[in-house]
Amino acid sequence: VKTDEGEFVGYNTDGLGFIRSLGVTDQSNKILMLGAGGAARGIIFAFKQLGYKNLSVANRTLENAKKLVDELQFGQAITYLEAEEQLQSFDVVVQTTPLGMKSNSKELPIQLKGIKEYTIVADIVYNPLVTPFLEEAEKYNVRTINGLGMLVHQGALAFSYWNGSYPNTDDMIQRLTEQLGG
């Protein structure tokens, strides 16, 4: 939140922070979002704002995915089973559920068998740096991205809103990776 011409303006930097960490600018990429919570909402909204066209939301509870898609007027809701069946068609898979955090089990939202070799698999969890989901993805020789970049870029975006300049995020990511044991 900052003031702009005497008015308070709020920004959600989650989505844009995630997309900056992803480093993907091809708007024709087909995106699979796993989870339909607050973080997914911010990321989906950012994909929509940036002109992406192909996004599917899979959630444990299909109704929650449908509700999110309807509210944002973007994407399509699918089941986890449909996500697994269509896995070959996605270019980017984004895991936004709390699965994989230190206190949770090794449970995966979907199985990754059959994933394309050049797919990007991201998990917004940053502690641990390598979640069970990313560990599974690495077995298929895909590019994996943990949530640390999202954390850093959303903070950098907030900093830029307040100060007018975007800080060097490479150093931040390196230092945080070292702090988290990576």
Language-model features and meaning:
Residues 1-24, 130:
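Phosphate/diphosphate ligand-binding glycine-rich loop within oxidoreductases
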Residues 22, 28-48:
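Glycine-rich adenosine-cofactor-binding loop
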Residues 2-3, 117-169, 175:
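Rossmann-fold NAD(P)-binding glycine/threonine-rich loop
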Residues 20-24, 45-49, 70, 135, ...:
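Short, well-ordered alpha-helices that flank and scaffold nucleotide-derived cofactor binding pockets
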Residues 33-34, 57, 123:
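Hydrophobic Val/Ile/Leu positions in short beta-strands of Rossmann-like dinucleotide-binding domains
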Residues 50-72:
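NAD(P)-binding Rossmann-fold cofactor-contacting core
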Residues 27-30, 52, 117-118:
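Phosphate-coordination loops involved in phosphoryl transfer and adenosine-cofactor binding
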Residues 76-144:
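Rossmann-like adenosine-cofactor binding region
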